């Protein structure tokens, strides 16, 4: 690990301004067509409850399509135009899609407990909240989603007035079935994102949409940016110098993408338009390429260790970070040496390569054998970072 790791920490000092442009990746909503689902059948409460109960079962795709059609039909933005006008104003192209016949009664009802909480007075809020929750499976894997449901969903749902969502079935098999139909590029996925954007466009529902899903779906890497800025401030280091000490070659492409994306987001007027740009990244054909702006788990690990030296408890967030145990130990040493290097004096002290060499020597214990010498691939976290600090 050591020699290969030393080579990757070469920094970005030779990468000048224009090189960080990313001319190949497009983040424009005008390249995305969002479906507006509709149903020829009249909606009634029992039909909606049946669809909710089927979410997570064999009829998940049809159930979610029908629920999208219901929300689109029932949503009347407060003085902001029609649903279609709102999405067109954000720059998206639209198409109408029929959901097909209503679902039949079956025994496959994994979300029956949630369905039974639905009454006429809360049906729109509960169904919308369910779609928000399901949308997270476009970014969270099943384990992450199960953890989210266990640790966060009840608190967030209750705070947003949809406490019924505590009855959402977080069984891993159920979550896997939902995630299987919400893949990048699928029309159902785009339809749900459209509903999120509709809610973000309406001041009456924007806070709920942000709290329950949008801040976790934007994927801008702002969590890492916030950690970086705080570390630079704590160290008294120039951001460019700290970047040289931390950046790996593997994130140069990510840097290009995030610079371009953030410039476009900065130009977008209004909260919904900004989210529209960010979400268009996740809905276009270049999804997997554009998704490369995820935070780098190793750098985040180091930054958290730096900030923990100034604000005890910061490193508590390292529990779910996917890095090897040897690297965790190395990250602590790098953080310690960076504090010694800068010590509030800016860019004085030894260079990055010497710093990494010293950290490697200090972090190597007697139990670290030859197997840890091999090159380690970049372990990005499966959760790209909740972008709660963006807005």
Curated annotation (Swiss-Prot):
Biased composition (Acidic residues): 368-391
InterPro entries noted in UniProt: Rhabdo_ncap_2
GO molecular function, one term: RNA binding
Localization, UniProt: Virion; Host cytoplasm
Major localisation: virion
Ranges where the record places region Disordered: 347-391
Record-level GO cellular component terms: helical viral capsid; host cell cytoplasm; ribonucleoprotein complex; viral nucleocapsid
Keywords: Capsid protein, Helical capsid protein, Host cytoplasm, Phosphoprotein, Ribonucleoprotein, RNA-binding, Viral nucleoprotein, Virion
Known function: Encapsidates the genome, protecting it from nucleases. If expressed without protein P it binds non-specifically RNA and therefore can bind it's own mRNA. Interaction with protein P abolishes any non-specific RNA binding, and prevents phosphorylation. The soluble N-P complex encapsidates specifically the genomic RNA, with protein N protecting the genome like a pearl necklace. The encapsidated genomic RNA is termed the nucleocapsid (NC) and serves as template for viral transcription and replication. Protein N binds protein P in the NC through a different interaction, and can be phosphorylated.
Family: Belongs to the novirhabdovirus nucleocapsid protein family.
Subunit architecture: Homomultimerizes to form the nucleocapsid. Binds to viral genomic RNA.
Name recorded for this polypeptide: Nucleoprotein
Organism: Infectious hematopoietic necrosis virus (strain Round Butte)
